[in-house]
Amino acid sequence: MNNYDKTMRFNLDDVPKENVKSVLTNVYNTLKERGYDPVNQIVGYLLSGDPAYIPRHNEARNQIRRIDRDEIMEELVSNYLNASKDN
């Protein structure tokens, strides 16, 4: 039996999860480097889900698409609330 005839299993646990902070930092820096307003572009992506808001440069688009938008928003809100609690 040929290896191509077997059903392969894919385990998401084997794929390293992207660190939300490092991805957002890269996306932010890439947007700034390209002359965009990073906050507006990221918000546009989060609200619409349209990856066209994020450039392909520096793998920014590929990186941010690997993370669920809900997970990004959860991280942003959590960090915002924790930061405002400290002030």
Swiss-Prot record:
Annotated Pfam families: IreB
Family as reported in the entry's similarity comment: Belongs to the UPF0297 family.
Protein's recorded name: UPF0297 protein Sca_1229
Organism: Staphylococcus carnosus (strain TM300)
Taxonomy of the source species: Bacteria, Bacillati, Bacillota, Bacilli, Bacillales
